[in-house]
Amino acid sequence: MARKSLIQREKKRQALERKYHLIRQSLEEKSKVSSLDDKWEIHRKLQSSPRNSAPTRLHRRCSSTGRPRANYRDFGLSGHILREMAHACLLPGITKSSW
């Protein structure tokens, strides 16, 4: 189980990313069609925004354990929890393959 402080930190990053998403998106679109001087100004504005507002700072975490690695997007679970739940028949439509 991940520490609760790490999970809270990730939630704070998600909130910041949602708050600054439209601002960052509009600045990035403007920088594609702007002159060099305007691009420097836009770059400075992007740099002045909070670091944790960038979408690359987000991690997907397991919904049951909070583990940040080996996550399956379709289920929102880490690999070993997915395997345990599949063996316990808690995931509908998931069966162990045999051939």
UniProtKB/Swiss-Prot annotation:
Keyword Aminoacyl-tRNA synthetase attached: no
GO MF annotations in UniProt: rRNA binding; structural constituent of ribosome
> Its principal location?
plastid
**One GO CC annotation, please?**
chloroplast
- Coiled-coil stretches, from where to where? none
Ranges for region Disordered:
46-67
Which biological processes are named by the entry's GO terms? Answer: translation
Protein family per UniProt: Belongs to the universal ribosomal protein uS14 family.
Matching entries from HAMAP family are given as: Ribosomal_uS14_1
Oligomeric state and interaction partners are given as: Part of the 30S ribosomal subunit.
Q: What does this protein do?
A: Binds 16S rRNA, required for the assembly of 30S particles.
Q: Could you tell me which NCBIfam families the record lists for this protein?
A: PRK08881.1
Name of the protein in question:
Small ribosomal subunit protein uS14c
Q: Which organism is it from?
A: Pinus koraiensis
